[in-house]
């Protein structure tokens, strides 16, 4: 019987893992009940027999044993569970239940991934959120880890805080006295953020669609708002009620019109909120930051919400229907600390921004700022209290360029050793950072003298112009004089109004004369003329009127354009040689074809006629192949000539030492090039008493210097091709 009971119990346990129909499940339940009854009755019989045998064998005890006192049943919420021995998983969270009088604080644990909560898409609907909320509730894990945090707290809960780019992060929010304390975890002893509620205004923004949340926006004068997401309307009203009670304990004045009860307010009109967007100023770059201990919200989200001000609160809050409850207490305004201030509107040039930094062969985006002649790299704009790297800039050298894949890259070198590799997002950003770094490193290098080998001419001009203007602004803003401010060779080192766009032109006698030379066609400011002694040396050596300042000004892109021009010239020479050899071969083939035709006519009717005809066919096939090769060669040569013409046209601007091939009728001949350099606005400004030649339009000079013929080059090329094909068909 006992063996049958054991086997039956094992069989029922096996059935628990199988799929059963409703009828079989009912039969299984009946068998289980019978088996339990049999086991219970069998157990009582065995126990009675054992007690009787023990009573017969043992002597009588001196006294009756005390009956066992059953342990009192304790509810699961009577005491805190023990701390886990192993470390908590990475995605472990604790969600606090709102604290009520006479109740112990509770929390909800969940192990969902934090990345899912930080997603900016917010695509979970209300039903999914309700399903996730059904989790086991129990007390805080330990008394020393959590009870001190919520001791004397008016309300506490885990709320979502909006970060920049619309991401959300979970914080433990506790209101004690008149302060809002935010903890990253319930085990932290120090709050991550502390916000005094005095002088703040709070706005409740209800959920208007399934993709948004119930939000509480707490705004303090002079700082960006703190946006917290609550789970429901009831929870928002509870927080508003507690905050109102906290206001009553503040020392500041309370405006009765600014604190209506939550129950009397109706939903906010969305159109009315969007109507008053102009009263809210978005953040400088559309991103969040941390100022004065208050985490700012995203710039895009900030533009969609109305920012309540003190003047509006007194006159319009009572008229606006909805859940918007503005509470302003006191006039205290806390100024942001200098450590947390990233940029100021009073600065001419912002010395901070995001850059890509090359670290361990990987590019990472970092928030970079220049302070006290140091380049400080932060992991994020919101984390300014800690930094990753601090690089002293004095004595460093700024070198633009890294490779062709990263054209907007610049490097910092100290004693020839690479200190940092940075990449900007645009040419303006690159020029701004180069100007800032040149000014902070104490370098007297002109931004135009640097080599920009991986960007084109137009982008190089933009980078140089922005770098020079930034360099001037930084030097003008500096309080103390630097060694590179007094250099006369670098006009952009003088913090004057003229230096923003033009150089201070040094004269022969050593005095400075603010003479505005004409700007070039591409908008790049023109450098001044060097002393006459240096000019004579340049004219004697090169035969072209070009000053040293000019050569230094337009040195950007020189290596790249020179290499392109040389490559095109060598390719043109190679194609011309191939064309000449092909022409000679075609002439030889035509002569052989003519001789073969004459030989066929002479040997008509003979045995050698067939061999001669086969040879003539092979010769004609070769002639066709050579002719097709000549046509493709002509097209390639035309393309190379056009590219070379463009490169040489840019050579005038860049001051290249490349001369066109002799014997060509190109408008870039040495004589024309000499005349263009003398008359163009790129040439040096004459500082002598005699008036120099007036600057003329370079484009007009190029247009007038084109060879005037009855037909255009394109038309002549087509006529030449037609004539060649007619001659070929005729032969």
From Swiss-Prot:
Domain PH as annotated: residue spans: 152-248, 348-442
Residue span of motif SH2-binding 2: 452-457
InterPro entries listed in its UniProt record: AFAP, PH-like_dom_sf, PH_domain
Coiled coil residues, start to end: 558-649
Residues with Phosphoserine modification: 283-284, 549, 665-666, 669, 680, 688
Molecular function as annotated in GO: actin binding; SH3 domain binding
Residues with the Phosphothreonine modification: 676
Biased composition (Polar residues): 678-687
Region (Interaction with F-actin) location: 595-638
PTM field: Phosphorylated on tyrosine residues by SRC.
Localization per Swiss-Prot or TrEMBL: Cytoplasm, Cytoskeleton, Stress fiber
A Gene Ontology term for the protein's cellular component: stress fiber
Biased amino acid composition, Basic and acidic residues: 271-284, 721-731
Disordered as annotated region, ranges: 56-90, 118-139, 252-318, 513-544, 658-731
Record carries keyword DNA damage: no
Motif (SH3-binding): 70-73
Cystine connections: none
Positions bearing N-acetylmethionine: 1
Entry keywords, A to Z: Acetylation, Actin-binding, Coiled coil, Cytoplasm, Cytoskeleton, Phosphoprotein, Repeat, SH3-binding
PANTHER family found in the cross-reference section: ACTIN FILAMENT-ASSOCIATED PROTEIN 1, ACTIN FILAMENT-ASSOCIATED PROTEIN 1 FAMILY MEMBER
Subunit structure: Monomer and homomultimer. Interacts via its C-terminus with F-actin; probably involving AFAP1 multimers. Interacts with activated SRC SH3-SH2 domains. Interacts via its PH 1 domain with PRKCA, PRKCB and PRKCI.
Function comment: Can cross-link actin filaments into both network and bundle structures. May modulate changes in actin filament integrity and induce lamellipodia formation. May function as an adapter molecule that links other proteins, such as SRC and PKC to the actin cytoskeleton.
Protein name according to UniProt: Actin filament-associated protein 1
Source organism per UniProt: Mus musculus
Gene, per the UniProt record: Afap1
């Amino acid at each position: 019987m006992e063996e049958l009971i054991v086997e039956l119990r094992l069989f029922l346990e096996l059935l628990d893992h199988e799929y059963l129909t409703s009828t079989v499940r009912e039969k299984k339940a009946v068998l289980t009940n019978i088996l339990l009854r049999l086991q219970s009755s069998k157990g009582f019989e065995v126990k009675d027999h054992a007690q009787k045998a023990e009573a017969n064998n043992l002597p009588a005890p001196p006294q009756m044993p005390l009956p066992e006192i059953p342990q009192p049943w304790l509810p699961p919420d009577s005491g805190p569970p023990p701390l886990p021995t192993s470390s908590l998983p990475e995605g472990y969270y604790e969600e606090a239940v709102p604290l009520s009088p006479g109740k112990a604080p509770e929390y909800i644990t969940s192990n969902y991934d934090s990345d899912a909560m930080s997603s900016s898409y917010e695509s979970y609907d209300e039903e999914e959120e309700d399903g996730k909320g059904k989790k086991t509730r129990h007390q805080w894990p330990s008394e020393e880890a959590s009870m001190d945090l919520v001791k004397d707290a008016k309300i506490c809960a885990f709320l979502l805080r909006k970060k920049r780019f619309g991401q959300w992060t979970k914080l433990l929010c506790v209101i004690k006295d008149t302060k809002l304390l935010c903890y990253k975890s319930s085990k932290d002893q120090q709050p991550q953020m502390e916000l005094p509620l005095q002088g703040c205004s709070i706005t409740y923004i209800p959920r208007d669609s399934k993709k948004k949340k119930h939000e509480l926006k707490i705004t303090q004068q002079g700082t960006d708002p703190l946006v917290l997401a609550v789970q429901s309307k009831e929870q928002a009203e509870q927080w508003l009620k507690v905050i109102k009670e906290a206001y009553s304990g503040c020392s500041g004045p309370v405006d009765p019109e600014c604190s209506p009860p939550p129950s009397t307010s109706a939903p906010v009109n969305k159109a009315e909120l969007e109507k008053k967007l102009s009263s809210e100023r978005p953040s400088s770059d559309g991103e969040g930051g941390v100022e004065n201990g208050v985490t700012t919200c995203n710039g895009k989200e900030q533009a969609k919400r109305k920012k309540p001000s003190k003047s509006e609160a007194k006159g319009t809050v009572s008229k606006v229907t909805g859940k918007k409850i503005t509470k302003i207490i006191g006039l205290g305004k806390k100024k942001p600390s200098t450590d947390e201030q990233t940029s100021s509107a009073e600065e001419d040039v912002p010395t901070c921004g995001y850059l890509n930094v090359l670290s361990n062969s990987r590019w990472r985006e970092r928030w970079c700022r220049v302070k006290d002649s140091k380049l400080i790299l932060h992991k994020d704009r919101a984390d300014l209290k800690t930094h990753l790297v601090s690089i002293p800039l004095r004595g460093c050298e700024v070198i633009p360029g890294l490779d062709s894949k990263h054209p907007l890259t610049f490097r910092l070198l100290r004693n020839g050793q690479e200190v940092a590799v940075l990449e900007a997002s645009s040419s303006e950003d690159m020029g701004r950072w180069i100007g800032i770094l040149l000014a902070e490193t104490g370098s007297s290098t002109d931004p135009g003298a640097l080599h920009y080998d991986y960007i084109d001419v137009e982008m190089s001009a933009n980078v140089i112009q922005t770098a020079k203007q930034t360099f001037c602004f930084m030097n003008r803003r500096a309080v103390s004089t630097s060694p590179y401010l007094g250099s006369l060779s670098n006009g952009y080192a003088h913090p004057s109004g003229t230096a923003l766009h033009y150089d201070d032109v040094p004269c022969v006698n050593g005095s400075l004369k603010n003479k505005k030379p004409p700007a070039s066609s591409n908008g790049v400011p023109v450098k001044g003329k060097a002393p006459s002694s240096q000019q004579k040396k340049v004219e004697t050596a090169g035969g072209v009127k070009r000053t040293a300042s000019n050569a230094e000004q337009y040195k950007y892109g020189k290596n790249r354009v020179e290499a392109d021009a040389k490559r095109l010239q060598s390719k043109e020479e190679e194609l011309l040689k191939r064309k000449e050899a092909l022409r000679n071969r075609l002439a030889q083939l035509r002569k052989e074809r003519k001789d073969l035709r004459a030989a066929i006519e002479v040997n008509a009717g003979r045995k050698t006629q067939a061999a001669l005809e086969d040879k003539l066919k092979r010769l004609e096939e070769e002639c066709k192949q050579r002719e097709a090769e000549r046509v493709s060669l002509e097209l390639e040569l035309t393309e190379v000539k056009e590219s070379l013409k463009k490169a040489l046209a840019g050579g005038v601007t860049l001051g290249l030492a490349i001369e066109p091939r002799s014997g060509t009728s190109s408008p870039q001949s040495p004589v024309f090039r000499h005349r263009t350099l003398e008359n163009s606005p790129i040439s040096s400004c004459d500082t002598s008493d005699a008036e120099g030649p007036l600057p003329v339009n370079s484009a007009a000079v190029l247009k007038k210097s084109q060879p005037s013929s009855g037909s255009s080059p394109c038309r002549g090329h087509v006529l030449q091709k037609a004539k060649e094909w007619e001659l070929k068909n005729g032969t």
